[in-house]
Regions:
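ATP-dependent helicase/translocase motor core
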Residues: 1-155, 159-167
Length: 167
C-alpha cells in the first residue's frame, strides 16, 4: 500500500474535533493544526473549527495548488537515508507570503525597507526562509528589478548552519 501514497502531497488526520496536516512521511508528532484560513483571522473556539479551518485554509482549490506548488519541500537525500518531505505550517505560509510582498515592494519602490522576520526558537524560521527563497527565485522572475536574486542566509549557530545545508 505505501506505493499508492507515493504521489500524495498532503495528509490530513482528524477525529472530527482535532485536525492536523502533514505528509505521508511526516511523523505523527510533527502533524500540525492549520489555525487560520487567512492571515489576520482570529482563532475560532467553536466546536469542529479546526476541521472547517483546515478545509477552507488548505483544501480550497487555489490554496491547495499554491501549497502543492510552493510549500512542499523534499530535503536533500545526501543528509538523510530516508526521503524527508516537509509541508509548511500556517505561520510559515503566511510569513513567507508577507515577506515576499514586502521585498517586492521594497525593490520596486527602492525604499530599502524589505522587512524583518522574528520568530521564537523552534518555530521553523529556517524553513520559512527556504519557502521565501523559493518564492523569490521561482515566482518573481517577471519582475525585472528582482530577476534572478542572490539569496544569502546568515545564521548565528552551527546547528542552524547544518540545518540550512540540508535545504
Amino acid at each position: 500500500i505505501p506505493h499508492l501514497l507515493h504521489y500524495c502531497p498532503l495528509a490530513c488526520i482528524s477525529d472530527g474535533v482535532k485536525t492536523r496536516l502533514g505528509t505521508v512521511r511526516t511523523p505523527y508528532e510533527h502533524f500540525y493544526a492549520w489555525r487560520r484560513v487567512n492571515d489576520g483571522d482570529k482563532l475560532s473556539t467553536l466546536p469542529f473549527a479546526e476541521t472547517e479551518t483546515m478545509i477552507k485554509g488548505v483544501y480550497s482549490p487555489k490554496r491547495f495548488l499554491e501549497i502543492f506548488r510552493d510549500y512542499i519541500y523534499f530535503q536533500d537525500s545526501i543528509y538523510d537515508k530516508n526521503e524527508v518531505e516537509i509541508v509548511c505550517r500556517y505561520p510559515q505560509f503566511f510569513a513567507s507570503k508577507l515577506l515576499k510582498q514586502s521585498i517586492i515592494n521594497s525593490v520596486v519602490t527602492k525604499s530599502g525597507k524589505g522587512g524583518t522576520y522574528f520568530g521564537a526558537t523552534g518555530c521553523g524560521k529556517t524553513y520559512t526562509m527556504a519557502f521565501l527563497a523559493r518564492q523569490l527565485a521561482l515566482r518573481c522572475t517577471d519582475i525585472p528589478q528582482i530577476g534572478s536574486p542572490t539569496i544569502i542566509l546568515i545564521v548565528d549557530r552551527d546547528e542552524l548552519q547544518k540545518q540550512g545545508a540540508k535545504l
